Amino acid sequence: MTKQIITLVGRPNVGKSTLFNRLSIRKKAIVHDLPGVTRDRKYTDGKIGSFEFLLIDTPGLDENPNSMGERLIEQTTKAILEADLICFMVDGRSGILPDDKLLSSFVRKYNKPAILVVNKCEKAFDFDKEYYKLGFDSMIAISAEHGTGLIDLYDEIIAKLPEEESIKTNIADPIKGDCLQIVVSGRPNAGKSTFINALINDERLLTGPEAGITRESIEIDWQYKNNHIKLIDTAGLRKKSTITESLEKLSASDTINSIKFANTVILMIDALAPLKQQDLNIASHVVHEGRSIVIVVNKWDLVKESEKEAFQEEFYYQINTHLPQVKGIPVLFISAINKQNIEQVLDACLKIYKIWNKKITTSKLNEWLNFTTEAHLLPLQKGGRRVRVKYMTQTKTRPPTFKLFSNNPEKITDSYTRYLVNNMREAFDMPGVPIRFIYVKTKNPYV
């Protein structure tokens, strides 16, 4: 089957070549010597996850398209016309510049599927209104240099491209033929490396009683029940002693980046160490990144039988109290050193990964929405008009994300959103995964 084509467009110095090399199957992008291709337009075979495509890098355009050199316009125009999808790149550090606005207009007139890719976002990034003014309905923040955000970019690319059979197959069965990336995270000395060694029946990872033996993230390719799995052992996350507990201050940035690229995160808890705020910070970070999560309490064999029931009751209470936004997180109690219940952890990961990839038809969504909103109406506003959520559709998976159309979305309270999300979990059997709602105002506020 002919590969689909993705074209990178943007002004100079926004990181097109860096992303081009990052996505290239080869470590260094090689220009294809194709007939009729000049040296100004570079081609390479690209890959994200299991999806392969042809990638085009275009010359940087930094002037008004009406006065640009004819050759640059010609090269970029040809690359746009060839494309099945355009990644329009801007620099997240410098923000939106006049050239970005001019170029976005130049690109949009071709009516090609497009994603706004905000590069150089090494830290958490919020899109302000200037980015929306560029006119793209899909926006992703990445760091091409560090490789962060590529899973989100992959999701948007799959959502935007025409649904070829090969892509449909990957979405319908997200595990077979794909690589499930499982990050094992937690505080130091919780037993992460011991757990992975027990799974693969091999002393691949150095273990011991000293906290912090693992100094960097280590990847292991593995097969489980005919599924290709990449297990990633991470350095234990601990707070810097001189800083507050805020999530941004967590040390071990390599571990934080591994979580960004994970499909599922196993949060390992030491049964002999009380549940701490740091554990909850890690779990909250996983949820904030939109990843699926499984909580594993290790060293369960060392807890007295007479204390286990009370331990579990208190543990579930703490998780449900501090992580109400993801009700139903799988929690398993294991002994890694004795290989007790360890396969149950992988089974839970496979199950929640499928939920994380769940796609619901628009008709079923709106049938549920009508019933749920009628059962619990939003209050009347001034003038006697009632706020209503009229329609919804699923815009992406990983995590399940939904766009809801309302006559007055700013009046929808957080408590009402929680009501909808919790109801959706039950109705569509979606425990333990982040569910995201995006509210959009309908053009006519009176309907």
UniProtKB/Swiss-Prot annotation:
One of its GO terms (molecular function) is GTP binding. CDD domains: EngA1, EngA2. Residues 4-165, 180-357 form the EngA-type G domain. Residues 358-443 form the KH-like domain. It holds the Pfam family KH_dom-like. Keywords: GTP-binding, Nucleotide-binding, Repeat, Ribosome biogenesis. GO terms for biological process: ribosome biogenesis. GTP 2 binds at residues 186-193, 233-237, 298-301. GTP 1 binds at residues 10-17, 57-61, 119-122. It comes from the Bacteria. Coiled coil: none annotated. SUPFAM superfamilies: P-loop containing nucleoside triphosphate hydrolases. GTPase that plays an essential role in the late steps of ribosome biogenesis. Belongs to the TRAFAC class TrmE-Era-EngA-EngB-Septin-like GTPase superfamily. EngA (Der) GTPase family. NCBIfam families: GTPase_EngA, small_GTP. Associates with the 50S ribosomal subunit. This is GTPase Der. It comes from Rickettsia conorii (strain ATCC VR-613 / Malish 7).
